[in-house]
């Protein structure tokens, strides 16, 4: 359960970073 949650958090983090880089 913890690994699945961590994977989701990492995935969301990468998506957010991608959006930020796209805006800059």
Swiss-Prot record:
One Pfam assignment: Antimicrobial_9
Tissue specificity as recorded in UniProt: Expressed by the venom gland.
Subcellular location: Secreted
Family: Belongs to the ponericin-L family.
Disulfide cross-links: none
Positions where Leucine amide occurs in the chain: 24
Secreted as UniProt keyword: yes
Its biological purpose: Has a broad spectrum of activity against both Gram-positive and Gram-negative bacteria. Is inactive against yeast, erythrocytes, and insects.
Gene Ontology cellular component annotations, sorted alphabetically: extracellular region
InterPro entries registered for this protein in UniProt: Antimicrobial_9 (IPR012528)
The keyword Secreted appears for this protein: yes
Domain of life: Eukaryota
Keywords attached to this entry: Amidation, Antibiotic, Antimicrobial, Secreted
Name of the molecule in the record: M-poneritoxin-Ng2b
UniProt GO BP: defense response to bacterium; innate immune response
